[in-house]
């Protein structure tokens, strides 16, 4: 570690190293200087050193070095010159951003260069293997190596700066600016993973701010400037999350904003709240939570109407229409029906959380909470006057879906209204904080609601209905979609329907109608019948004469007297009932008064206990503050005692606070440190002079000692050289003697070597031959196994193909059999239809024949009798023959005696009347036209009367 007397020397040394290309050594030198304890007093030179330091860190992509240096520099200048730290950090981020942009501009394929899932993750083994196998040596790989590292370094830069600036009241603005730039980085380059981590980092910083409340320079969220900075950061986070499509992170951002507002107990400006509710509508719409989406729209409408006075009538109409359509899009049944107890509890907690996010007010008691529901939302729309601001199409749609009872043509009337609504919407004016409103997004949900309403109304009128008729009545969807909607409604206990696809019918299971539903049906039925009666029987004109008006005066007076007596008794009963109700109300009021008194007493006791607890806490805090003040004063006295100036400590009694005393102590310590550094610099300078003088005096002595040492070492070297030569001669003579001694055994060694080599060669040949035989056997056995396996596979495949062929033949035979049966059934049905048609024609011929015979009989009777008479009543004809003719002798029958029955036509003849009597009229006033229809009927058809079931829908249509 190099030591420099002055910081300027370190800066010069670093520049020299950079000039010769040794950037790593220059960075290390500056790092040692910055992290050294000698330079803890801020000076302008340190700022220049930090600029050079961050430039080297950016050039070499050393994020860890940059973080360590910035932390040390923050310690140095935090109490002296915080603006210097801001300038260094801004320069650092500017350099990192500039280098990242430069690398991005150099890359020609940005899409491939940025295709990295996580900037903090290393390369996976699979990616490395794929790159080596595929030989990725071209431009794509160079782009990855060029662009991705710089974006990774830029992301590390943002993280480092946020970590350094966190929870510091003097650096709040720079912290907010860095967070905004980090959000824009994630938004510009679609970095979803880094955005989630960034949100978590900011969330942890706020949690630590609330956790460590006694730290120095802690931001005060109750200050308007600090609160506005934090809120702006959170709203920017919310906007970027919605633009990136991270809806879960956007919802967590909403919770962060709500928690921040609850923490400081302040509501932001109306412009921010409009953005808040606008993003809530998008989040709830994407999560298919239509109820909360509608409530958020209602809050947004209230804000726009209350605070935005420049809003045009058209924009207000579109926003109000969105509110009503969002409310209508809410499913009309309970989504949590059939859930378990645990799921219901979780849903209650979730609903409570969302209600707090939407309304910012929560009832403390659970029994007093009003649950968010579709009915309460619609009633609130009416009470707040939203319906008066919507377009006429939306009003018509609301009336059709919520007030009308049209079980047959509801969907047909709703469809053109939805077509008009889908064309409404568009961009709003710049005055409105809502950029765009599209009403067409609600059309699918409204079509589903219209389908549910139609099925509900049909189920209240009919028992069965054909599937084809349902499809014709609902033009929005196919029957598969209608069936899916019906199944969901049945699962939620909204409908009770059974679908029989074999018969093509939909059975609407009988249910006991609720009083409300039956009342609505009866009301519509009464109105329809009243209109029909008025059309058939118009009201008669009032009598003009006074006598006609007073004809029943006595009866009217009697009725009026009875009515007055009944009214008097009713009034007496009502008075008694009212007195009883008053007594009951007094008892209830007394009970309530006692409960309120009891609750007041309990609240008073709680208040007294809370005040006592508060006083006790204040006393404890006062004791802690006094003790800390004493410790700080003692520290200040001790610092003054250590000081050489013997300055009297500044104490003003109760006016001195802990913060002031701590600042005095810190200033004193800083002054002592600076004086100590000056002394050390002076001492280092004197030591340099002393060392230089010592070395000048010691230089001649060292030179003479060196020459003497050279002479001694030369003599020693010559002596050791002679000794080594003598020893070498002695070793050579010994080696020659040893060679002569071993030369006589050379022949024996050769014989033994040949013997061993021959035996080893024979053994090697044998083992090689055995190995070859073993390999041949293994190869032969494997060939046999392979052949057997191939035969088995061939056999299995052949068998499988045979089975498949048999199966296909069987299926073809079954299809032919089914087609043959279907054809025979069609032929049989055609024959039956032909037989039925022939029988119908024969019956028509019989009727015509019978009619002609009847007319022939009438003509004969008219020709015989001088006066017309009523034709006789015909009996039932035979199965296949006509009616028997009446004999003509009956016309000239003699006059019977008294007491005998005489037919009517004979009595007419005997009386000799000039004209025939008029025909009798039935009691219904049907006229004198005789009934020419035959009195027989087809025995094959069941009678059309006497059925106890309700009329089905197709029958009523006929």
UniProtKB/Swiss-Prot annotation:
Entry's Gene Ontology BP terms: formation of cytoplasmic translation initiation complex; translation reinitiation
Bias type Basic and acidic residues, positions: 804-859, 929-942
Organism per entry: Nicotiana tabacum (Common tobacco)
Protein name according to UniProt: Eukaryotic translation initiation factor 3 subunit A
HAMAP family, per the entry: eIF3a (MF_03000)
Composition-biased stretches (Polar residues): 946-958
Role summary: RNA-binding component of the eukaryotic translation initiation factor 3 (eIF-3) complex, which is involved in protein synthesis of a specialized repertoire of mRNAs and, together with other initiation factors, stimulates binding of mRNA and methionyl-tRNAi to the 40S ribosome. The eIF-3 complex specifically targets and initiates translation of a subset of mRNAs involved in cell proliferation.
Subunit description: Component of the eukaryotic translation initiation factor 3 (eIF-3) complex.
InterPro entries: EIF3A (IPR027512), eIF3a_PCI_TPR-like (IPR054711), PCI_dom (IPR000717)
GO function term, MF aspect, one: translation initiation factor activity
Keyword annotations from UniProtKB, A to Z: Coiled coil, Cytoplasm, Initiation factor, Protein biosynthesis, RNA-binding
Coiled-coil stretches noted in the UniProt entry, renumbered to this chain: 93-123, 548-696, 796-861
Pfam families: eIF3a_PCI_TPR-like, PCI
């Amino acid at each position: 570690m190099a030591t420099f007397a002055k910081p300027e020397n370190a800066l010069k040394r670093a520049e020299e190293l950079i000039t010769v290309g040794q950037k790593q050594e220059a960075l290390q030198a500056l790092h040692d200087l910055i992290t050294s304890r000698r330079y803890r007093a801020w000076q302008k030179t340190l700022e220049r050193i930090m600029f050079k330091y961050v430039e080297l860190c950016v050039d070499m992509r050393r994020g860890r070095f940059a973080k360590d240096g910035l932390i040390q520099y923050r310690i140095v200048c935090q109490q002296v010159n915080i603006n210097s730290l801001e300038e260094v950090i801004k320069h650092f981020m500017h350099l990192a951003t500039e280098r990242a942009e430069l690398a991005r501009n150099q890359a020609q394929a940005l899409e491939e260069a940025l295709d990295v899932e996580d900037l903090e993750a290393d390369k996976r083994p699979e990616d490395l293997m794929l790159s080596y196998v595929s030989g990725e040596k071209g431009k794509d790989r160079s782009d990855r190596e060029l662009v991705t590292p710089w974006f990774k370094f830029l992301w590390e830069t943002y993280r480092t700066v946020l970590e350094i600036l966190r929870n510091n009241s003097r650096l709040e603005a720079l912290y907010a600016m860095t967070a905004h730039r980090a959000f824009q980085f994630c938004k510009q380059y679609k970095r979803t993973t880094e955005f989630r981590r960034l949100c978590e980092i900011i969330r942890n910083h706020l949690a630590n701010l609330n956790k460590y409340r006694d730290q120095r320079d802690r931001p005060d969220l109750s200050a308007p400037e600090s609160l506005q900075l934090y809120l702006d950061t959170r709203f920017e986070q919310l906007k970027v999350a919605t633009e990136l499509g991270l809806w879960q992170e956007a919802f967590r951002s909403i919770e962060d904003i709500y928690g921040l507002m609850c923490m400081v107990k302040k509501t932001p400006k109306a412009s921010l709240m409009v953005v808040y509710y606008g993003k809530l509508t998008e989040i709830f719409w994407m999560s298919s939570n239509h109820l909360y989406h509608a409530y958020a729209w209602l809050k947004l409408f209230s804000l726009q109407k209350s605070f935005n006075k420049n809003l045009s009538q058209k924009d207000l109409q579109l926003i109000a229409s969105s509110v009503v359509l969002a409310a209508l899009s809410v499913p009309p049944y309970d989504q949590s029906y059939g859930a378990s107890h645990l799921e219901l509890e979780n849903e209650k907690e979730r609903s409570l959380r969302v209600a707090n996010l939407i309304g910012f007010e929560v009832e403390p008691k659970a029994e007093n909470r009003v649950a968010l529901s579709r009915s309460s939302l619609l009633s609130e729309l009416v009470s707040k006057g939203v319906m008066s601001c919507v377009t006429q199409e939306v009003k018509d749609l609301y009336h059709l879906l919520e007030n009308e009872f049209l079980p047959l043509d509801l969907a047909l009337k709703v469809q053109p209204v939805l077509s008009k609504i889908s064309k409404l919407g568009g961009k709003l004016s710049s005055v409105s904080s809502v950029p765009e409103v599209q009403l067409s997004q609600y059309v699918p949900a409204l079509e589903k609601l219209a389908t549910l309403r139609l099925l509900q109304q049909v189920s209240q009128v009919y028992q069965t209905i054909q599937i084809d008729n349902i499809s014709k009545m609902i033009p929005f969807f196919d029957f598969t979609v209608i069936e899916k909607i019906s199944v969901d409604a049945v699962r939620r206990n909204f409908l009770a329907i059974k679908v029989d696809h074999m018969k093509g019918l939909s059975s609407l299971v009988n249910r006991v109608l609720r009083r409300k539903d039956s009342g609505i049906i009866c009301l519509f039925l009464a109105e329809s019948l009243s209109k029909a009666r008025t059309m058939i029987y118009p009201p008669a004109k009032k009598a003009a004469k006074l006598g006609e008006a007073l004809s029943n005066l006595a009866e009217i007076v009697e009725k009026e007297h009875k009515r007055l007596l009944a009214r008097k008794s009713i009034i007496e009963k009502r008075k008694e009932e009212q007195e009883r109700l008053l007594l009951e109300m007094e008892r209830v009021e007394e009970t309530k008064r006692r409960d309120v008194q009891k609750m007041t007493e309990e609240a008073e006791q709680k208040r007294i206990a809370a005040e006592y607890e508060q006083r006790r806490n204040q006393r404890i805090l006062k004791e802690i503050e006094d003790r800390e003040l004493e410790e700080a004063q003692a520290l200040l006295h001790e610092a003054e005692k250590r000081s050489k100036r013997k300055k009297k400590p500044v104490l003003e009694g109760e006016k001195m606070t802990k913060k002031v005393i701590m600042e005095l102590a810190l200033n004193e310590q800083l002054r002592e440190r600076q004086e100590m550094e000056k002394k050390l610099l002076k001492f280092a300078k004197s030591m340099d002079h002393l060392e230089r003088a010592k070395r000048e005096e010691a230089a001649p002595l060292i030179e003479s000692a060196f020459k003497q040492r050279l002479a001694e070492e030369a003599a020693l070297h010559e002596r050791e050289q002679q000794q080594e030569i003598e020893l070498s001669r002695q070793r050579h003579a010994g080696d020659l003697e040893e060679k002569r001694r071993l030369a006589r055994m050379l022949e024996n060694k050769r014989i033994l070597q040949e013997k061993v080599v021959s035996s080893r060669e024979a053994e090697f040949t044998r083992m090689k031959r055995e190995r070859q035989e073993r390999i041949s056997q293994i190869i032969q056995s494997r060939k046999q196994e392979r052949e057997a396996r191939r035969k088995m596979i061939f056999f299995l495949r052949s068998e499988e193909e045979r089975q498949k062929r048999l199966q296909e033949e069987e299926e073809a035979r079954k299809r032919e059999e089914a087609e043959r049966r279907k054809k025979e059934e069609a032929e049989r049905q055609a024959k039956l239809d032909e037989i039925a048609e022939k029988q119908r024609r024969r019956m028509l011929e019989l009727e015509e024949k019978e009619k002609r015979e009847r007319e022939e009989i009438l003509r004969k009777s008219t020709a015989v009798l001088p006066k017309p008479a009523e034709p006789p009543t015909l009996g039932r004809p035979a199965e296949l023959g006509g009616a028997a003719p009446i004999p003509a002798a009956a016309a000239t029958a003699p006059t019977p005696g008294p007491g005998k029955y005489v037919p009517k036509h004979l009595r007419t003849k005997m009386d000799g009347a000039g004209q025939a009597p008029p025909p009798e009229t039935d009691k219904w006033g049907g006229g004198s036209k005789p009934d020419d229809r035959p009195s027989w009927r087809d025995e094959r058809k069941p009678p059309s009367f006497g059925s106890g079931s309700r009329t089905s829908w197709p029958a009523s249509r006929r």
